[in-house]
């Protein structure tokens, strides 16, 4: 079984089978309570799937793009769970969940706050399934892209409202089956935090 976690928007957890089929899921839309939500959501998903931590063979985590604090919470929980069980942790870009089996170029857009969008462009994979990333995630001024935009520069525009952790698992499993290399487990922060530790 696979445990999948994403905290790039709200906080979302799912348990899937080895192929990425969802068995249980839970989420919180509150973008300010990641730390309070993550533990109970994991416990609920395991219980709903009628399994224990010992039944989990891999963890998939969304690595953003997302805000500094939210991403840290979800990724830390995923890595801690995997470390405790001595199982692999797989990293997937959160935007990838909006681009499974697309048939045209697609621009995935999420709210980066401070008057900006976070954007990632994708192109369809010739074999179907998870799309290929054709641009690294970049920031765009909100003034350049209205919230009701459906097409830009030849690409369909999709705005992120939520991220499905079960689809994260599907993407990870599919990419590994195709022999593709997954991302390094590093967060794709929208920007660095306002407050940093002194050197």
Question: For each predicted feature, which ranges?
Answer:
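Short glycine/serine- and small hydrophobic-enriched flexible loop segments
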Residues: 43-44, 83, 170-174
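Oxyanion-binding and handling regions
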Residues: 1-22, 29, 33-37, 90-199
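DPxDG-like acidic metal-binding loop motif
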Residues: 58-87
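N-terminal, well-ordered alpha-helical segments
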Residues: 36, 40-43, 75, 79
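Phosphate-handling active-site elements
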Residues: 49-54, 82-92
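Short, well-ordered turn and helix-capping elements at secondary-structure junctions
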Residues: 29-30, 42, 65
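Phosphate/pyrophosphate-binding loops at sites that engage ATP/ADP/AMP, CoA/4′-phosphopantetheine
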Residues: 42-58
């Amino acid at each position: 079984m696979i445990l999948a976690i994403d905290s790039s928007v709200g906080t979302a957890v799912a348990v899937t089978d080895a192929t990425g089929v969802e068995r249980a899921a839970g989420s919180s839309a509150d973008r300010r309570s990641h730390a309070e939500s993550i533990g109970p959501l994991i416990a609920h998903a395991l219980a709903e799937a009628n399994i224990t931590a010992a039944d989990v063979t891999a963890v998939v985590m969304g690595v953003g793009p997302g805000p500094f604090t939210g991403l840290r919470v979800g990724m830390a929980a995923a890595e801690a769970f995997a470390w405790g069980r001595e199982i692999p942790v797989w990293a997937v870009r959160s935007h990838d969940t909006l681009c499974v089996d697309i048939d045209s170029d697609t621009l995935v857009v999420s709210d980066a706050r401070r008057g900006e969008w976070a954007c990632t462009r994708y192109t369809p994979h010739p074999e179907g399934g998870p799309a290929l990333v054709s641009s690294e995630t970049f920031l765009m001024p909100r003034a350049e892209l209205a919230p009701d935009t459906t097409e830009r520069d030849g690409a369909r525009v999709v705005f992120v409202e939520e991220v499905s952790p079960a689809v994260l698992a599907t993407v990870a499993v599919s990419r590994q089956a195709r022999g593709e290399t997954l991302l390094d487990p590093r967060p794709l922060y929208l920007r660095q935090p306002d407050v940093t530790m002194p050197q």
